Amino acid sequence: MKRGKLIVFSGPSGVGKHTILSKIINRKDLNLAYSISMTTRKKREGEVNGVDYYFVNDEEFKKAILNNELIEWAEFVGNKYGTPRTIVEKLRDEGKNVILEIEVVGALKVLDLYKNDDLISIFLLPPSIDELKKRLLKRNTETLETIKKRIQKATHEITIKDYYQYNIINDNPDHAANQLAEIILNEIKQS
């Protein structure tokens, strides 16, 4: 069985990463597995532990770092996010193409760590910073101060888009999802 690819899919908070992935994750031709991240942030309404994230406390997260159990991790606005190593490697060994939906800081670590591996890197961009701000406000899950910090961070993150193999502008979720699927299919066919 051929080992699966590692797909790094990142972009600013609120750009629509989760929405886009939900449109293609179950496509059989892509053979995708979603890498579930570990986080110390509070669970949002409707989120399920072990499905959306592994929600842990700060002590459990620190232990995972010390035991080298995370491929990458980053902290933002007091919350930590990381990718559990054993889950990703197990899925790839099973032939699955594993999608890491991660923050830009963590993504850059993965791009460096796996640069000689079967890696696909895709950066999702908003049509504009104003549109991104509207999306974050529409979520209605964070304070205005947190949204301001996310916009500042996004402005910086967008400058890093050229570190990725592919860029997709999310001006329409269906169109962006189709672009993402096409990129993955083309990369699978080339290997």
Swiss-Prot record:
Keywords: ATP-binding, Cytoplasm, Kinase, Nucleotide-binding, Transferase. The keyword ATP-binding applies. InterPro entries: GK/Ca_channel_bsu, Guanylate_kin-like_dom, Guanylate_kinase, Guanylate_kinase_CS, P-loop_NTPase. It is an enzyme of class 2 (transferase). It holds the Pfam family Guanylate_kin. GO terms for molecular function: ATP binding; guanylate kinase activity. Coiled coil: none annotated. One of its GO terms (cellular component) is cytosol. Signal peptide: none annotated. Residues 4-185 form the Guanylate kinase-like domain. It catalyses: GMP + ATP = GDP + ADP. It is found in: Cytoplasm. ATP binds at G11, P12, S13, G14, V15, G16, K17, H18. Belongs to the guanylate kinase family. Essential for recycling GMP and indirectly, cGMP. HAMAP family: Guanylate_kinase. This is Guanylate kinase. It comes from Ureaplasma parvum serovar 3 (strain ATCC 700970). The lineage of its organism: Bacteria, Bacillati, Mycoplasmatota, Mycoplasmoidales, Mycoplasmoidaceae.
